[in-house]
Amino acid sequence: MKTGRGVGPTDAAGGPARHLPVMLAEVLAHLAPKDAGTCLDGTFGAGGYTRAILEAANGRVIAIDRDPTAIAGGQALVEETGGRLTLVHERFSHLDQVAQDLGAAPLDGVVLDIGVSSMQLDEADRGFSFRRDGPLDMRMANDGPSAADLVADLDEVELAHVIWTLGEERFSRQIARAIVNARAESPITRTTQLADIVSKVVWAKPGEMHPATRTFQALRIAVNEELQELVGALAAAERVLKPGGRLVVVTFHSLEDRIVKNFLSHRSKAPSASRHMPQAEGPAPSFRLVAKGAVEPGSDEVAGNPRARSAKLRAAERTDAPAHPDGDLAGLLPADLSQRRGRRRS
């Protein structure tokens, strides 16, 4: 997840980060930036991928981030690169509109690095980390309901569903019940307060994942509508890439990777024919897979940056076929999330 998204040797949900770009060599190899080309980095963070792209070729980069702190922190890189970098405060589901507004469409490449950044984890006041006491916030763009709002407002069944669906937490019902019981005594407004509640329900052996990891993941994804945003960004990239343009996506857990895998699988297959319908109708493939399956980090990278162990990279090249209609995108999401996109815009 770029400089500011890769983290160091402690737990990804809360420890101090060293800001190491994850799978940087693999990202550059699959993105293949060109001189005079234009690439879009949809998740700027602290600019690790963006800087590397600018150093790899004498082209232009448009970098997007929904977090205003990241945009402010990138101004020095804008000045350093002599006008080849444009920073935009926006959600990456709108990346096609950003490129069009800047007169940069169609694009030669799009890179997406999904999830929370280590900068956000490092700042206790952002409320992402269960290891750092802070307000239970988790909003990447400081708009809309916070994690504390969800914890206060969702009923027990809804909480359990969020924690199970978005955190893949098998103790979701017990955790939801504990949250409801605890909030009846006093409001849950601090990160460590919630982490303590979860830790009393989920036990972990020394060296295992912190008990609150999956619950925090679920709330963060829900607060920021991360899966809906990812689906929107994939479709936006399909619309704005030129033929031969590359899409590279790095994910860090199975929910994200499954969406990317299914999207690229569907977009890279020709319509199926059968003896009943020998001339199958349907959209032509809009992508060609560059990486056959997921690319994973090497052992040396994982040893130096343990968070990289869960990273998966998928890459594809745009064909000259028209973009597919958006009607089938909802199938990439859990059913109850497919109708919730676009409630908020930062």
Curated annotation (Swiss-Prot):
Binding-site list for S-adenosyl-L-methionine: 47-49, 65, 92, 113, 120
GO cellular component: cytoplasm
Biased composition (Low complexity): 328-337
Catalytic activity: cytidine(1402) in 16S rRNA + S-adenosyl-L-methionine = N(4)-methylcytidine(1402) in 16S rRNA + S-adenosyl-L-homocysteine + H(+)
Enzyme Commission number: 2.1.1.199
Family: Belongs to the methyltransferase superfamily. RsmH family.
NCBIfam families, per the entry: 16S rRNA (cytosine(1402)-N(4))-methyltransferase RsmH
Protein name per Swiss-Prot or TrEMBL: Ribosomal RNA small subunit methyltransferase H
UniProt source species: Azorhizobium caulinodans (strain ATCC 43989 / DSM 5975 / JCM 20966 / LMG 6465 / NBRC 14845 / NCIMB 13405 / ORS 571)
Primary gene name: rsmH
